[in-house]
Regions:
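Short, small-residue alpha-helix embedded
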Residues: 68, 191-192, 253-276
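Short pre-catalytic strand/loop immediately N-terminal to key active-site residues, enriched for Gly-Thr
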Residues: 56-62, 243-256
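Phosphate-handling active-site elements
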Residues: 77-82, 269-283
Length: 310
């Protein structure tokens, strides 16, 4: 198939998290500035080279978080997105009114259908509503020998509201976290996983090290739920490297889906073959840019702008 692309304007500056397909074309466009013709030949022989990622998460009917946010994030990074739906939520920018879990059989069937057919480069997990689903997901990850997993342990919201029951939380801690290449808890989730209170940067660092001891190969404790400048500070620990990652604080109320977007961006970067720490750095920068172009839709908290101006 012959695809012809005409460029009508210069690509805005965006370095760290620029997706590979945009970056590759941008290098050509930058040399010619405007109205260049780019021809790209795509054949079936190239299909196996297309990076593929999977999201195992819930659906957000309002389109701001969950698999909707994940798939948009994958698309931005030019990664083909696949999905395993774990629950269906009725929600909008103002809140959640209903949650229905998918059956374990459905979750299993979705996962196996994709895994036996495609070469998945990375997987992220999001909302796993109950103990049974968490166990099924963990069992299938082990059965397929898949290790490139980003675990977003969706247990507590950034406002401190518990989202799953205590039994599911324990299963998340004991069964799924040890399978994570990268675990990405927010403040309140990190408090549960690390069994400690978190009020300072030093607490975040200690929590990251404690969660690492649960078996995760690396941990990113997010500033979500923290106050002041710490809202834009995350802490990374991988057993050797303890890093503080800080970006500018974006003044917006429209932050719905931020955590989903971050973990999806990390997974996309892993699928592109980037090392874990680099994948996290670029994902964090991507989310910062997306927050600058957050969408003021609905009557409440809108989502981040996944496709900020390109």
């Amino acid at each position: 198939m012959l695809v012809s692309v005409r460029v009508g304007r210069i690509i805005p500056k965006y370095k760290a998290a620029t997706p590979f397909c945009v970056l590759g074309w941008a290098k050509i466009w930058a040399k010619q500035n405007l109205f260049l013709e780019l021809t790209h030949i795509m054949t079936n022989s190239h299909s196996s080279q297309i990076p593929i990622a999977m999201t195992i998460a819930g659906s957000d009917s309002g389109g701001g978080a969950g698999i909707q946010a994940d798939l948009r994030t994958f698309a931005f990074h030019c990664v083909h997105g696949t999905s395993v739906l774990t629950c269906i939520t009725a929600q909008n920018t103002q809140g959640v009114t209903r949650v229905d879990a998918m059956s374990p059989e459905s979750v299993t069937a979705q996962f196996e259908a994709v895994m036996i057919d495609m070469r998945i480069g990375a997987i992220k997990t999001g909302m796993l509503l109950n103990q049974e689903i968490i166990k099924i997901v963990a069992k299938k990850l082990v059965a397929f020998g898949f290790g490139n997993v980003v675990v977003d342990p969706v247990m507590v919201s950034r406002t401190g509201a518990q989202l799953i029951d205590d039994e599911a939380i324990k299963t998340m801690r004991d069964v799924l976290i040890p399978l994570a290449a990268i675990a990405t808890p927010n403040r309140y989730e990190a408090q549960i996983l690390a069994d400690m209170d978190i009020h300072s940067l030093e607490d975040m660092q200690t929590a990251a090290q404690n969660i690492y001891k649960l078996g995760a190969r690396s941990v990113l404790v997010k500033g979500g739920g923290m106050t002041g400048d710490l809202k834009a500070v995350d802490v990374w620990f991988d057993g050797d490297r303890l890093e503080v990652l800080q970006t500018e604080v974006i003044d917006t109320n429209h932050t719905h889906g931020t955590g989903c977007t971050l973990s999806a961006a990390i997974a996309a970067n892993l699928a592109l073959g980037k090392p874990r720490f680099q994948a996290v750095q670029e994902a964090k920068n991507y989310v910062t840019e997306a927050l600058k172009y957050a969408l003021a839709i609905g009557k409440g908290q809108g989502p981040v702008g996944h496709f900020f101006p390109l």
